[in-house]
A protein has these predicted regions:
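His/Asp/Glu-enriched, well-ordered alpha-helical/loop segment
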Residues: 90-97, 139-227, 239-242
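Conserved, mostly hydrophobic/aromatic
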Residues: 35, 65, 88, 100, ...
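Metal-coordinating catalytic core of metallo-dependent amide/deamination hydrolases
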Residues: 1-105, 109
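Long hydrophobic segments that form regular secondary structure
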Residues: 106, 110-119, 124-130
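Glycine-enriched alpha-helix->loop->beta-strand junction motifs that scaffold or abut catalytic
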Residues: 52-61, 93-96, 113-122, 143-149
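Histidine/acidic-residue-rich catalytic or RNA/ligand-binding cores of hydrolases
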Residues: 70-82, 110-115, 132-141, 158-174, ...
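Short, acidic/turn-prone active-site loops that include or flank metal/cofactor-
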Residues: 68, 125-129, 154-156
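Active-site microenvironment of metallo-dependent hydrolases
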Residues: 193-319
Length: 319
């Protein structure tokens, strides 16, 4: 009983912290806050329901990892008698203001459920590939009318370069379907811009250049060997460009970077602070984690899997 009460208190503390964060930051300047429970395996259904209620009552979006890896689906079937997407739908998380991250292992029925509830998808192809999650059914979802945007997931993906994300998104689908036209450069560019804005619920403010929209613009330097033939611009941007090809950025009409010089911060200081924070994080993680991070490449994979335990992979299906 004591442990349960302690858990309830901790949940209340978390909700209070989230409420304070929303009050402080949502709608200030260009900042928009969403509620982001990690996944159905990170928190209890009870806390998930509380976060859903908070988001709905405040008119905020929800974002959570759903059916990203095969084993979360198999464990969901084992524990709840339903697949992961079916589970979050049962809890009440799906809907027009809900962003489902990854959504790799979706059955045809679940894909239809996403469409029927007008839920949104944050597709993270680089993270999915790097972590061995699988290939999300992006063309199938788009055919059903689902809004699919592009994401980076997090540091585990090893990139925040959206050009690389675009290229990976297109390439994975071509290989998966053995069809070079299943997801075109134009499709992918839409996912990175107008579709991404719809996923975020910001389509009336960002996502394209039009009268009344915020002036969010990047200037790409095409005078480079890999970009010099600048016909078929969509293909060039998706398949050849990289983040370092961006020369200048403008956000809401304000120039933040000009000729690759960031105007709003001291880059060297930020990099030094980040390096120090990384060292501190690894140090505090303990000797076992430091050991694993320092392992050489032939043994790192097996050691990580051994450390994760026998349930590291339980299999699953997206069929």
């Amino acid at each position: 009983a004591y442990e349960d009460m302690a858990m309830i208190r901790r949940e209340d503390e978390l909700m209070a912290e989230a409420d304070a964060f929303i009050r402080q930051w949502h709608g200030t300047g260009l900042t928009t806050v969403a509620v982001g429970p990690g996944s159905t395996e990170d928190i209890s259904d009870r806390l998930m329901a509380k976060t859903i209620a908070m988001a709905r009552s405040r008119g905020l979006q929800l974002a959570t990892h759903v059916a990203g890896w095969a084993e979360i689906v198999s464990r969901s079937v084992k524990h709840y008698g339903m697949r992961d997407l079916e589970h979050v739908h049962h809890i009440g998380l799906t809907g027009p203001a809900s962003i489902l991250i990854h959504a790799v292992w979706l059955s045809p029925h679940e894909q239809q459920l996403v469409a029927e509830t007008d839920s949104k998808i944050a597709h993270c192809p680089v993270a999915n590939a790097h972590l061995g999650y699988g290939v999300a059914p992006v063309p199938e979802l788009r055919t059903l009318g689902v809004d699919v945007g592009l994401g980076t997931d997090g540091a585990a993906s090893y990139t925040y370069d959206l050009f690389e994300v675009m290229k990976t998104a297109a390439m994975l689908q071509k290989v998966q379907h053995l069809n070079a036209e299943v997801l075109t450069a134009e499709d992918t560019l839409e996912m990175a811009t107008v579709d991404g804005a719809r996923v975020l619920g910001l389509e009336e403010r960002i996502g394209c250049l039009a009268p009344g929209m915020r002036a969010d613009i990047i200037l790409v330097d095409f005078r480079q060997p890999h970009l010099i033939l600048n016909h078929q611009l969509a293909s060039k941007l998706v398949y050849s460009a990289r983040g370092h090809d961006v020369a200048s950025t403008i956000v809401d009409g304000r120039v933040l970077m000009r000729d690759r010089q960031v105007l709003t911060m001291d880059e060297d200081r930020v990099l030094d602070d980040a390096a120090a924070a990384c060292r501190d994080l690894v140090e505090r993680a303990g000797i076992e984690t430091r050991d694993l991070l320092g392992a050489t490449w032939p043994e790192r994979g097996p050691r990580w899997r051994k450390a994760a335990g026998p349930d590291w992979y339980e299999g699953g299906t997206n069929g």
